[in-house]
């Protein structure tokens, strides 16, 4: 509502003309930031007023008070202590609010000197915090990026441009994305905030970003993305004369980069960190994994959005924050270039062959710091001495790490390892700068003082000497004056009226002969004096704390500017350390969990021997259980495996594990298998176990069909498709028909690798006329009424779904199971016979079974229900649903 009001209307609403000067100052700043919660610094608190206060008190759970009146209404107010700001910011950002931080730009004393005792302290917004522009360690995840993205859709709409930046690490990248892949690319990046033109607010794209991905969108007017404006912003920011200095980029990429830089300028109030020139990447240089597949495979998060049980949590044994972020990026963006994949695998193999080196390096890496984010805080003037010390300790440790390699290999390291560790040589000049200037016990807050070593600057030493030894200097001066006057009882005292003074008894007044003693005050029994020397000492003592903090800030700023000059080197060092962490991590898990180096080919091979699901295997190990490994042999001649068998037997796990093995291999890691030979996968698609999406108005079947449609439209010959129970959400006949036609399309048109699990046993006959399709099933053992799932994939087809066995395992009452068995027996006696196709006209015309007529309504309903069911075709889910229906009828 406020955003739609003009300035005059706003002033009228808040009775601006009769408000106090301080409240007018608040309103002026609030009117300029209507889309933000305004935190207004007043002394030791950040205060909020009016609607902001009401909203914040609810979100933060703090007391709502009042301050004065707005006409007849009292002004709502709440506040938070300045030193606890980050704790409250976390809640506001998590609630998706933009927060404007308004700070005092001068002290109350400075305000009085400027405009008298009625002067209002100067305040202004120093930055705007949004989900995509956070740099505070406590507000962002340490082991994953925090991206702000700008998405620009050109008029032809065939290719969009996306620029994304992580302000906390100064990473900035731009990429062109096909229109059909926009959601998939956003799912890969998981940006905390997306800039989008206001013209797209009502578009299907914006709706999908918000509803399907649940990402925050910040809309900007269309002119925000204007090409001429954005080009000028880029040239000014990078101090260039020609946009070609960025590289070969399109007009829409210019708009994406420029809009990101402009947004950072607006939110950071010109205080943007030193960003490198944007890295231009090609969209097809990494594997496409759509958002549904990322969710189904639980790559970086589990199905609830947490980390436990995800592939990332299983593979992540990194020991540094930046290493954790790099692994996150690797898993989000597996490579598709064989040469680059093999380059990574060679690095992993080197460390796997040198596990003693790995052990030493991992211990040393634990002593390094997240210098990427330290550097960003330094460049944005939000650092502390501890950030500089972190850089110093990391420089020191880096040289020790390089020594580990030298001790083991001397000058005979492979070139690809030498390239990684080259930045570890350190920078003696930078190390010495920090070592000579910053105290080891430097505080977090510059205003506390004590950050600069005393010996670095004589004035700092002098001021700290005054602070620490002020009483001693007063005592020395007192002793000097006693000698000069001969008055042994002379004292130097202090009060709040005249400050420091020389105090003698009245009977000794005749001994004060030197004119340097200036009379200040006479009492009944005492006379008080001062001297220029005492006044100077007093002034120095009073101002020493303020002066030393001011001087230390100046020196600290100068030191930081020298550190910033080394930004490029520090980023290379951070990259080297994070790379070492990730590849040592790969070697560690390969050794710990018996992973093997995969081999890559340029054909459609997918030859996995004794493959395992890493997440499930780790969970079983915690229970002292073993994972049952399985082979998978896909090729040009055998591209599709049609897998039948009961639920709980391991079909879904088998499907997922092979997709995961492809992902792990293409990030450069060894894989959980005895051997692996893989033709590079350009895209992975999965459709596994979709739940009803009633909020979005989509049933299970509709969600399934939408996902399947997208898979068929976007897959290529080099893709890997895993499908589980396609067609299950509709009638049996419809489901079989859809699954049948989907398989034909994949076989005849796409000709890509596919694992297809189903309960529709009728589909197994397709192997008779689709040469690249083969039937596989899950091995089981039957003992009377009991079955044992062996979890082995074997050649052949299942002839039953074992739905009632699954229902029994689920804990249905024995009476229900027994009754279901009786009904199933009736089905089997009167069914069309095993092995016949459900699509045959005979099966459509035959009555399924006959029940003894009964005059009751229940019997009639049962008869009607059973007449529509073929028991051989029941999936476990359908059998379970049938049991519930029978229970209701009975």
Swiss-Prot record:
Gene3D superfamilies per the UniProt record, alphabetical: 1.10.1420.10, 6.10.140.430, DNA repair protein MutS, domain I, MutS, connector domain, P-loop containing nucleotide triphosphate hydrolases
Keyword Nucleotide-binding: yes
SUPFAM superfamilies: DNA repair protein MutS, domain I, DNA repair protein MutS, domain II, DNA repair protein MutS, domain III, P-loop containing nucleoside triphosphate hydrolases
Keywords: ATP-binding, DNA damage, DNA repair, DNA-binding, Nucleotide-binding
An annotated Gene Ontology molecular function: damaged DNA binding
Keyword ATP-binding part of the UniProt annotation: yes
Example GO biological process: mismatch repair
Binding site for ATP: 645-652
Organism: Rickettsia conorii (strain ATCC VR-613 / Malish 7)
Domain of life: Bacteria
Pfam families in the cross-refs: MutS_I, MutS_II, MutS_III, MutS_IV, MutS_V
NCBIfam families named in the record: mutS1 (TIGR01070), PRK05399.1 (NF003810)
Protein name as it appears in the record: DNA mismatch repair protein MutS
HAMAP family xrefs: MutS
Function, as annotated: This protein is involved in the repair of mismatches in DNA. It is possible that it carries out the mismatch recognition step. This protein has a weak ATPase activity.
Family affiliation: Belongs to the DNA mismatch repair MutS family.
């Amino acid at each position: 509502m406020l955003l739609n009001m003009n300035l005059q209307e706003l002033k009228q609403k808040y009775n601006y003309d009769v408000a106090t000067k301080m409240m007018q100052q608040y309103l002026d700043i609030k009117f300029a930031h209507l889309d933000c919660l305004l935190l207004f610094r007043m002394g030791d608190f950040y205060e909020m007023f009016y609607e902001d206060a009401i909203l914040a008190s609810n979100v933060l759970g703090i007391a709502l008070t009042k301050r004065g009146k707005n006409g007849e209404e009292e002004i709502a107010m709440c506040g938070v202590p300045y030193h606890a700001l980050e704790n409250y910011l976390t809640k506001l950002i998590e609630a998706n609010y933009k927060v404007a931080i308004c700070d005092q730009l001068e002290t109350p004393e400075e305000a009085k000197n400027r405009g008298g005792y009625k002067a209002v302290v100067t305040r202004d917004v120093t930055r705007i915090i949004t989900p995509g522009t956070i740099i505070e360690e406590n507000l962002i995840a340490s082991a994953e990026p925090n991206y702000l993205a700008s998405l620009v859709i050109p008029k032809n709409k065939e290719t969009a441009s996306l620029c994304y930046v992580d302000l906390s690490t100064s990473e900035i990248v731009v990429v062109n994305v096909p229109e059909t892949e926009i959601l998939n690319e956003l799912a890969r990046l998981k940006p905390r905030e997306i800039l989008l033109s206001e013209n797209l607010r009502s578009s299907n794209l914006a709706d999908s970003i918000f509803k399907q991905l649940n990402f925050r969108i910040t809309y900007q007017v269309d002119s925000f993305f204007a090409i001429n404006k954005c080009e000028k912003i880029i040239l000014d920011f990078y101090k260039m004369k020609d946009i070609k200095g960025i590289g070969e980029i399109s007009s829409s990429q210019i708009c994406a980069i420029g809009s990101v830089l402009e947004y950072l300028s607006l939110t950071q109030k010109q205080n943007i960190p030193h960003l490198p020139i944007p890295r231009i990447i090609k969209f097809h240089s990494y594997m496409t994994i759509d958002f549904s597949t990322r969710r189904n495979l639980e790559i970086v998060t589990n199905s609830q959005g947490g980390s436990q049980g995800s592939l990332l949590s299983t593979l992540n044994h990194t020991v540094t924050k930046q290493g954790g972020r790099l692994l996150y990026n690797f898993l989000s963006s597996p490579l598709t270039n064989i040469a680059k994949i093999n380059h990574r695998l060679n690095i992993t193999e080197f460390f796997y062959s040198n596990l003693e080196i790995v052990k030493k390096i991992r211990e040393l890496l634990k002593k390094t710091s997240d210098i990427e984010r330290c550097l960003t805080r330094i460049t944005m003037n939000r650092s502390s001495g501890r950030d500089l010390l972190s850089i110093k300790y990391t420089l020191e440790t880096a040289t020790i790490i390089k020594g580990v390699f030298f001790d083991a290999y001397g000058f005979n390291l492979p070139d690809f390892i030498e390239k990684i560790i080259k930045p570890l040589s350190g920078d003696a000049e930078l190390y010495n700068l920090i070592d000579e200037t910053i105290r080891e016990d430097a505080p977090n807050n510059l205003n506390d003082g004590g950050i600069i070593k005393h010996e670095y600057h004589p004035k700092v030493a002098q001021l700290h000497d005054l602070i620490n030894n002020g009483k001693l200097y007063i005592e020395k001066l007192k002793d000097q004056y006693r000698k000069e006057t001969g008055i042994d009882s002379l004292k130097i005292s202090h009060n709040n009226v005249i400050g420091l003074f020389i105090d003698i008894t009245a009977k000794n007044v005749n001994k004060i002969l030197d004119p340097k003693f200036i009379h200040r005050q006479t009492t009944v029994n005492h006379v008080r004096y001062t001297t220029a020397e005492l006044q100077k000492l007093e002034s120095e003592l009073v101002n020493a704390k303020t002066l030393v903090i001011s001087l230390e800030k100046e020196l600290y700023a100068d030191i930081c500017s020298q550190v910033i000059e080394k930004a490029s080197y520090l980023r290379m060092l951070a990259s080297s350390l994070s790379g070492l962490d990730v590849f040592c991590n790969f070697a560690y898990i390969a050794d710990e969990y018996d992973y093997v180096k995969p081999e890559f080919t340029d054909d459609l091979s997918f030859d996995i021997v004794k493959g395992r699901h890493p997440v499930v295997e780790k969970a079983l190990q915690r229970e002292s259980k073993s994972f049952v490994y399985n082979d998978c042999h896909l090729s040009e001649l055998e591209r599709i495996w049609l897998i039948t068998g009961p639920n709980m037997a391991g079909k879904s796990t088998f499907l997922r594990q092979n997709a995961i093995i492809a992902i792990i291999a293409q990030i450069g890691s060894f894989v959980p298998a005895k051997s692996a030979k893989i033709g590079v996968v350009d895209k992975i698609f999965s459709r596994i176990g979709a739940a009803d999406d009633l909020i979005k108005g989509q049933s299970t079947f509709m969600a399934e069909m939408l996902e399947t449609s997208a898979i068929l439209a976007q897959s290529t010959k080099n893709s890997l498709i895993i499908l589980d129970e396609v067609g299950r959400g509709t009638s049996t006949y419809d489901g079989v028909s859809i699954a049948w036609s989907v398989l034909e399309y994949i076989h005849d048109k796409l000709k890509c690798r596919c694992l297809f699990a189903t309960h529709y046993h009728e589909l197994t006959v397709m192997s008779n006329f689709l040469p690249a399709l083969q039937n596989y099933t899950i091995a089981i053992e039957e003992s009377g009424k009991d079955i044992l799932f062996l979890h082995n994939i074997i050649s052949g087809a299942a002839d039953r779904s074992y739905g009632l066995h699954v229902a029994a395992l689920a804990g249905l009452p024995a009476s229900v199971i027994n009754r279901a068995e009786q009904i199933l027996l009736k089905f089997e006696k009167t069914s069309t016979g095993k092995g016949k196709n459900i699509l045959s006209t005979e099966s459509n015309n035959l009555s399924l079974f006959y029940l003894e007529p009964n005059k009751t309504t229940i019997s009639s309903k049962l008869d009607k229900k059973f007449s529509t069911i073929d028991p051989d075709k029941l999936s476990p889910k359908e059998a379970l649903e049938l049991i519930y229906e029978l229970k209701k009828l009975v």
